[in-house]
Structures are given as C-alpha cells and as structure tokens.
Amino acid sequence: MPSGVLARVLAVAIVLMGGAVAASAAPAAAIFPFEIYDTSGEAPQSDLNERLAMATQVLSEALEKTGRYSAVDLGPFSSEVAAAAPRYRCGDCFLPVARKAGAAVAIVPVVHKVSSLISSMDIWIIDASNGAAVAHLGGQIRGDTAQAYEHGVRFLVRNRLTEDGSPADGAAPK
C-alpha cells in the first residue's frame, strides 16, 4: 500500500476512534459533600467534618475509577452548595446548583447516624434535568470512624452501583 494511502487510512481510523471515545465519555456528576443526619442523641465527634470531607473525596475517586461518572468542580458554587442543605430532605434544592455546574447527574450522599456503633449510608444519583432517581446505593456501616466511612463508601460503589444505572431501590431524596 502506498505510504500516502496508509497515512490517510490511519488518519481516518484515529479520527473514528477519537469520536468513539468522545461519544462514550462519562456523564458529568455534581458530587455533593456527605452530610450527617444524626438521631443518636450523642455529642458530635471533633473529627466529624474531616471524616465527611474524606468520605466525599473517596466517593469522588471511587466513582471516577468506575468510569461511569466524571466529577465536576463544585468549588465555584460553594456558597450555593452550603445553602442547599440539608440535601437529604430538601426536595430538589440541589438541582439548580448541579445544573449551573454543568452536571448531568447530582450525587447526594448522607450518613444517618443512629448510634456510635450503627449508621446507614445512602448515596442517591439523581438526573439533574428532571430530578428522577438514576440509582440509590444504600447500606449499613458499623462504627463512627474514618475507617468505617471509607469502607462504607467503597463497598457501596463496588457492590451496589448497578451496571445499567437502574435504581437499586427506586427512591429519590424528596
């Protein structure tokens, strides 16, 4: 094959492959910070805010690693993120922020602390265009420690994120 023809064939192949990669890009996700819904009656631990921030970072990294979502930067919207709280019971107050950030989905995580031993962790993935639940990852965690939170996040992403994106239990935080 003449080198000019080979160069054109390779150029077309590269363009087509690049288009396939672009077409399969992961949806942009507004990953909101973890919140605590504490019904334990216990005094909050001094490291709670750091633990919630760490859990949010672990969630962002774990979701990116799956290739299913690409996190958008919510930093420029920090005051709006703070005002849209508590997200686990505000209806869809977080959706305008997600849309402003250019996200296709909003990811809303919460830890419901029942006691220092028992908590539940929920992560809702919500379609930013219409507020419909895309998926719900939920489970129990044991312990009120950074290690328990990290393990809980990794477990939920690894074992509860459905392959087809259908709701695991259907419920959105409303």
What are these regions (language model features)?
Residues 25-39, 55-58, 62-67, 96-101, ...:
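C-terminal/domain-edge helix-coil "capping" segments
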Residues 8-20:
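Bacterial N-terminal signal peptides
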Residues 41-42, 83-85, 119:
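Short, well-ordered secondary-structure micro-motifs
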Residues 107, 121-122:
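Hydrophobic residues positioned within well-ordered beta-strands of beta-sheet architectures
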Residues 65-108:
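Short, solvent-exposed, polar/charged sequence segments at loop or secondary-structure edges
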Residues 1-5:
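N-terminal secretory signal peptides that target proteins for export/translocation
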Residues 51, 55, 86-89:
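Generic, well-ordered alpha-helical segments
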Residues 42-54:
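Glycine- and acidic-residue-enriched helix-capping/strand-helix junction motifs
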